[in-house]
């Protein structure tokens, strides 16, 4: 390969996150570097799914183009420490900020490339002016509730459900999201003819 890789780790509070730094030939402090943040659900540094490793492929292409990357295992996965629990997007953003700190010690121009939830995290970091640039791959530009409703609606329609069948289910989901944010009693599916 026309680049080097280096196994690294960084900490965020009680968590140690492990990853792979991919360094193009002739890299220096002036080489741009991207922190790669995975999408929702626990994922390894390569965002591996069905033996496909999209983050490894992207890191390879970027290194060949002269851009360094750091991709890392999510909390509690691969070589990263943690016991599984309920983590939020804010928690994963905090992990990404810790990764950016590691990169800033070695590089002058540091950005974030995020996929799905990682794209949203990239935008959150950019809004705080903590990255020099970002790349969002399918990051949400609408609320999480709106995204989940849309995803469920599309999935159910794709499975052949009619609008009349999908509507009460999505109404129940809307109520559940509202209860999760504002408190109250979770909806009973029987009340929605689901």
What residue spans do the PLM features occupy?
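Alpha/beta-hydrolase
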Residues: 37, 72-74, 137
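Accessory cap/linker subdomain of secreted extracellular hydrolases
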Residues: 137-194
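Conserved alpha/beta-hydrolase
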Residues: 57-79
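Primarily recognizes the serine-hydrolase "nucleophile elbow" in alpha/beta-hydrolase
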Residues: 99-161
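Short beta-strand element of the alpha/beta-hydrolase
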Residues: 30-40
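N-terminal cap/lid segment of alpha/beta-hydrolase-fold proteins
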Residues: 1-29
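The serine-hydrolase catalytic nucleophile loop
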Residues: 44-57, 74
């Amino acid at each position: 390969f026309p680049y080097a890789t280096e196994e690294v780790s960084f900490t965020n509070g009680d968590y140690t996150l492990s990853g792979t730094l991919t360094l193009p030939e002739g890299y220096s402090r002036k080489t741009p570097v991207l922190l790669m943040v995975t999408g929702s659900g626990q994922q390894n540094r390569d965002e591996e799914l069905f033996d496909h490793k999209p983050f490894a492929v992207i890191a390879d292409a970027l290194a060949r183009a002269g851009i360094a990357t750091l991709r890392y295992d999510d909390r509690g996965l691969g070589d990263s420490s943690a016991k599984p629990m309920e983590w939020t997007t804010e928690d994963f953003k905090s992990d990404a900020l810790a990764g950016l700190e590691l990169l800033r010690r070695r590089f002058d121009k540091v950005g974030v490339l995020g996929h799905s939830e990682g794209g949203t995290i990239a935008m959150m970091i950019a809004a705080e002016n903590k990255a020099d640039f970002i790349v969002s791959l399918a990051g949400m530009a609408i609320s999480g509730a709106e995204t989940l409703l849309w995803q469920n609606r599309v999935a159910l329609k794709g499975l052949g459900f009619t609008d009349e069948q999908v509507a009460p289910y999505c109404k129940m989901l809307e109520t559940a999201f509202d209860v999760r944010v504002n408190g109250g009693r979770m909806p009973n599916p029987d009340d929605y003819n689901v």
